[in-house]
Amino acid sequence: MDENKQKALAAALGQIEKQFGKGSIMRLGDNRAMDVETISTGSLSLDIALGAGGLPMGRIVEIFGPESSGKTTLTLELIAAAQREGKTCAFIDAEHALDPVYAKKLGVNIDQLLVSQPDTGEQALEICDALARSGAVDVIVVDSVAALTPKAEIEGEMGDSHMGLQARMLSQAMRKLTGNLKQSNCMCIFINQIRMKIGVMFGNPETTTGGNALKFYASVRLDIRRTGAIKEGDEVVGNETRIKVVKNKIAAPFKEANTQIMYGQGFNREGELIDLGVKCKLIEKSGAWYSYNGDKIGQGKANACKYLKENVDVAKVLDTKLREMLLSPANINDESAELVEEMPEQEEF
């Protein structure tokens, strides 16, 4: 660059930093914090599919899917993981349906969890913005976008038309929230529901509520679906679940994770460790027997899972090794995602 231009640029940068504060403008390569801080989702296969080891701090995340597909369970698992790291979490329960007993079963410290049950959509989003601006909250969950009812709709008559009111409310909130979340390094997760577009003959008729603003502002969008039931005899004890990363600004999108959600327990972490361990050749499978470091850990997957549940230290070491293999910068490529996508349909217990 020309010397005069360099001097002019240096003067301009100095003026900007003086006026707006240090770090308000920088060269992209200067900031080593381009490695985005993440929080584990509680599912190893989903962390790998996301490509960064979890969901990113300081960003907006959208999780959507049909009813009873595991959306709230996923957010509660993430809250539990964040609390174990000493982070402060808040749950804005617009649906007024949060079950503290279930949250506690998933490992959430309910004594430390901030909960709000707002009356209107505007109130919910104002609370969300205030928590983000405080700089003291690390994770905010809004459950759900569909339940964020504008004040005008609540105060109006049952048959009144309020065209685009919720979409306008959310669009304004996204503009305000994005910068505040980034400055305070706070993650905001919006749970959303699915609706059907009437008259769509070709393509996917499904859409999410609340207009298009959330789709644009979200750094990560997860589509979670129940694909089957897990049975013990005739009793259903959990769901086979597929989670697709439909948008990802921190790594490559369109990866999928297949996992299990057990009723009252959350993600079947041990089952994921065994499946990925076999794929990465850390666990040997010979017939029905599973072996780790030369020692047999169980006959059949259910017994191997039981061994890992009882031996937490072994499970932690295995988890760390798998993360190093599949998430280290040198090894992040399509292969790690393929391992997750190709995971076998997990056996019934």
Swiss-Prot record:
A GO biological-process term: DNA repair
GO molecular function: ATP binding; ATP hydrolysis activity; ATP-dependent DNA damage sensor activity; damaged DNA binding; single-stranded DNA binding
CDD domains hit by this protein: RecA
Disulfide bonds: none
Key word Nucleotide-binding present: yes
Keyword annotations: ATP-binding, Cytoplasm, DNA damage, DNA recombination, DNA repair, DNA-binding, Nucleotide-binding, SOS response
Binding residues for ATP: G65, P66, E67, S68, S69, G70, K71, T72
Record's subcellular location: Cytoplasm
Superkingdom of origin: Bacteria
Task of the protein: Can catalyze the hydrolysis of ATP in the presence of single-stranded DNA, the ATP-dependent uptake of single-stranded DNA by duplex DNA, and the ATP-dependent hybridization of homologous single-stranded DNAs. It interacts with LexA causing its activation and leading to its autocatalytic cleavage.
UniProt family annotation: Belongs to the RecA family.
PANTHER family: MITOCHONDRIAL DNA REPAIR PROTEIN RECA HOMOLOG-RELATED, RECA
Name of the protein described by the UniProt record: Protein RecA
Organism expressing this protein natively: Vibrio vulnificus (strain YJ016)
